[in-house]
């Protein structure tokens, strides 16, 4: 019996492991209810030991049990910390080349959006947000879109099949309607966000993109205020030498309406591929709020007037960083995105 205890003691002391499976094997073999140590206590050999040595024999067996438990904890610690030279947790070889762990950066759309917001924030504009799933009233009717307007067709707008009155917003002008409904003039706000159009995805178009639209409503607001606001924005965003021009246009929610161009900051107005040799690049649309839009928001157009403007963030980003394919913004190509890690 003593020889068996000595043999088990030596085996336990010399036991080593390289995996969790071997650790579990040790536990089952020596510490479980059916293990070797428990079997010795319950076995025939121990029961037949002479009474005068049974006490000392029991003490030796208890020492063996304590040794097994201690050894198990020691092996467990070594496995967890990787301090066992033979374990699967190998020591770190400091001579090996380091695998670079690069930190992420901001997306170019976010960079430009924050730049735009910073400029307008300095001019006293606050930030507004609204739902991307919008109802027909806020997306079309309140903005003076007639019933037969092409934007209401399925070719241009994503409608919810179960409820045709619900759409994916086609512009963030719907946010401006909600602001006017819930806030009394003076109102000065910008509303950036995702918008959706039923368009085929290509290098120049996408079904989802980002807009930022501005709204100013107060007494005696004029087109001159609109021009000065966008003039200041253009110089802050694209450089102090930037010039702007307005071309007559049409939008249902503004009258008069205009398209805004800026002098090409790539060629300084001399003509290049970016501006198609014209010296000008289109940035967005703007105009004075149509009185019907104010009436729909329960604002008296005889007392208040206002202007609105909108521009595509992707377009500004593409111009600013000379990006030629719109799809790059949504493809998550790390080679493309890492170029903007330190962009300003």
Curated annotation (Swiss-Prot):
Its EC number is 6.1.1.20. It is found in: Cytoplasm. Its cofactor is Mg(2+). Keywords: Aminoacyl-tRNA synthetase, ATP-binding, Cytoplasm, Ligase, Magnesium, Metal-binding, Nucleotide-binding, Protein biosynthesis. One of its GO terms (biological process) is phenylalanyl-tRNA aminoacylation. GO terms for molecular function: ATP binding; magnesium ion binding; phenylalanine-tRNA ligase activity; tRNA binding. It holds the Pfam family Phe_tRNA-synt_N. It is an enzyme of class 6 (ligase). GO terms for cellular component: cytoplasm. Mg(2+) binds at residue 255. It catalyses: tRNA(Phe) + L-phenylalanine + ATP = L-phenylalanyl-tRNA(Phe) + AMP + diphosphate + H(+). Binds 2 magnesium ions per tetramer. Belongs to the class-II aminoacyl-tRNA synthetase family. Phe-tRNA synthetase alpha subunit type 1 subfamily. HAMAP family: Phe_tRNA_synth_alpha1. Tetramer of two alpha and two beta subunits. This is Phenylalanine--tRNA ligase alpha subunit.
């Amino acid at each position: 019996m003593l020889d068996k205890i000595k043999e088990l003691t030596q085996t336990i002391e010399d036991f080593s492991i390289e995996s969790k499976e071997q650790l579990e094997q040790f536990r089952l073999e020596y510490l479980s209810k059916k293990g070797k140590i428990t079997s010795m206590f319950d076995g025939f050999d121990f029961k037949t030991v002479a009474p005068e040595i049974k006490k000392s024999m029991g003490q030796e067996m208890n020492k063996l049990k304590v040794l097994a438990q201690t050894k198990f904890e020691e092996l467990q610690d070594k496995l967890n910390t990787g301090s066992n030279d033979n374990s699967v947790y190998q020591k770190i070889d400091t001579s090996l080349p380091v695998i670079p762990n690069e930190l992420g950066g901001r997306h170019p759309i976010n960079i430009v959006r924050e730049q735009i917001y910073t400029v307008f924030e300095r001019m006293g504009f606050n930030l507004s947000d609204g739902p991307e799933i919008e109802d027909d009233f806020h997306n079309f009717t309140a903005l003076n879109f007639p019933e037969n307007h092409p934007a209401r067709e399925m070719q241009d707008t994503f409608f919810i099949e179960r409820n045709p009155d619900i759409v994916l917003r086609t512009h963030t002008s719907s946010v401006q309607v909600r602001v006017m409904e819930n806030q009394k003039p003076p109102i000065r706000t910008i509303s950036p966000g995702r918008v959706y159009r039923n368009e085929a995805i290509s290098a120049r178009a996408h079904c989802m993109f980002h807009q930022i639209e501005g709204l100013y409503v107060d007494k005696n607001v004029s087109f001159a205020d609109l021009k000065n606001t966008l003039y200041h924005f253009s110089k802050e965003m694209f450089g102090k030498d930037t010039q702007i021009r307005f071309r007559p246009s049409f939008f249902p929610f503004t009258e008069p309406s205009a398209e805004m161009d800026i002098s090409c900051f790539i060629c300084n107005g001399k003509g290049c591929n970016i501006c198609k040799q014209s010296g000008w690049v289109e940035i967005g649309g703007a105009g004075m709020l149509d009185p019907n839009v104010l009436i729909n928001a329960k604002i008296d157009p005889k007392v208040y007037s206002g202007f609105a403007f909108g521009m595509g963030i992707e377009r500004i980003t593409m111009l600013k960083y000379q990006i030629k394919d719109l799809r790059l913004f949504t493809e998550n190509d790390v080679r493309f995105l890492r170029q903007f890690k330190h962009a300003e």
